Amino acid sequence: MFQVQKELAGHEVVIVALFEEEKMSSFVQELDKAFEGQLQVLLEEKELSTKKKAISKVHSLGKTNVKRYYFVGLGKKESYTTETLRAALGKAFKTLQVAKVQDAAILLDSFVTEKLDAIDVAHIAAEVQGLGTYELQTYKSDKKDREELEKFTAITAEDAQEIEAALTVGYVHGRATNSARTLVNMPPNVLTATKLAEYAVELAEKYDMDYKVLEKEEMEDLGMGALLAVNQGSVEPPKMIALIYKGKEEWTDVIGFVGKGITYDTGGYSLKPREGMVGMKGDMGGAAAVLGAMEIIGELRPEQNVIAVIPSTDNVVSGTAFKPDDVITSMSGKTIEVLNTDAEGRLALADGITYAKKLGANYLVDVATLTGGVIVALGNYTTGAMTNNEELFEQVLEASMETDEPIWQLPIFDRDKERVRNSKFADLNNSPGREGHAVMAGTFLGEFAEDTPWVHLDIAGTSETKGAHDLGPAGATGAMVRTLATLVERFGEE
């Protein structure tokens, strides 16, 4: 699909950057010569817009060997960022998709500034081409054929091999994020814990990873009472899924991802209202993020060791379901008083974290649609984070900045730990109250990470969006897929 060329050569469409500067860039000046000065006129008449995310279409009318040019407004160079570029290109690729364009090129060097080099632009362009044109996988009987871009060419004077490599990495990041989106959007009668495990196994086999899928009896033998308690009310069997990627000769410095895999959450006996229950098919967004990251890792083969653990079940009501006031024993041996059956994700993750440590994880990052509290605190654009290790958190933060997936650190104080340890009947309680809800959930998980360096990512607000946006339609976003993968790719770098 991707090609790299030094010059334009008969493309259907070429994408060109337009900055809000007094002078046209050298690339636009060269084009303007072919247009006999008419581009300058269009700029002066505001027919070509330099505003951020503005898309202006110009027909060549035979003046060049390209049929149409799409000029992408990027605003002022001084405020130009990777986020600006992602948003603008996302809109551009959507426009091409609507126009059913099959052969497009990007004048890569026109997007390059002191802040962003050609490799950065190539990576983002290929990534966004996939993200921006993603379409919901529906179950409608009258499915329409998807329009795909068949050929995409980067026009640049830079080294073709390096640019092609950046295009490939960007494409892999975008495609894997879309894989996660599709998982999150799947209905709960289709994506059960069993089906999620089957998907994970197929992924592992495709990329020659080791894997384990623990069944209920094996979980009982290992004492995974927290996950098993959540599963008590279900007719669907639980699964503890583990994918193991060995990127080094020695099994050291193992990064452990733990993704919440609750395939549907009614709240259990602490029953959600109807408004709160609709959409809970997406409560396995953390599992999807982890699997998306493992897809990228499988494709790119970084020299790191990585474990992905997914505790999976649904949380439903029945005569056998666990109840408020129950006391359960986790795999770690710590006992937990259940005060809220709708705080089930942290119970599943508790055993997932302990199991990841048992498999050899030296560093832990858990990802979960964990609390409504994080949405109240940070909104729908920023992922909440907590940690017991600032050095590991800084690496996660840098990865999130590179991928434009913002995170914000929330605190863990000793008084927070006291609140999750204040049960009269057990070592911990799973729901100390609504105050500081997001912090309480993360603090609870920290009790199981213990001294292992750990970062918690609460994607309850960022995993899905209600409306279409520059990088895709309403629905699942694939939050944290690219951040997790980038963390692995950059892990340990100074």
Curated annotation (Swiss-Prot):
Main subcellular localisation: cytoplasm
UniProt family annotation: Belongs to the peptidase M17 family.
Function: Presumably involved in the processing and regular turnover of intracellular proteins. Catalyzes the removal of unsubstituted N-terminal amino acids from various peptides.
One Pfam family matching this protein: Peptidase_M17_N
HAMAP family assigned to the protein according to its UniProt record, in alphabetical order: Cytosol_peptidase_M17 (MF_00181)
Binding site for Mn(2+) 2: 260, 265, 283, 344
Binding annotation for Mn(2+) 1: 265, 342, 344
Cofactor binding: number and manner: Binds 2 manganese ions per subunit.
Keywords: Aminopeptidase, Cytoplasm, Hydrolase, Manganese, Metal-binding, Protease
One GO process term, biological-process aspect: proteolysis
Listed NCBIfam families: PRK00913.1-2 (NF002073), PRK00913.1-4 (NF002074), PRK00913.3-5 (NF002083)
GO cellular component: cytoplasm
Cofactor dependency: Mn(2+)
Active-site residues, record numbering mapped to chain: 272, 346
Name of this protein: Probable cytosol aminopeptidase
Class of the enzyme per the UniProt entry, highest EC level: hydrolase
Transmembrane segments: none
Its EC number(s): 3.4.11.1, 3.4.11.10
Subcellular location: Cytoplasm
GO molecular function, one term: manganese ion binding
Reaction(s) catalysed (UniProt annotation): Release of an N-terminal amino acid, Xaa-|-Yaa-, in which Xaa is preferably Leu, but may be other amino acids including Pro although not Arg or Lys, and Yaa may be Pro. Amino acid amides and methyl esters are also readily hydrolyzed, but rates on arylamides are exceedingly low; Release of an N-terminal amino acid, preferentially leucine, but not glutamic or aspartic acids
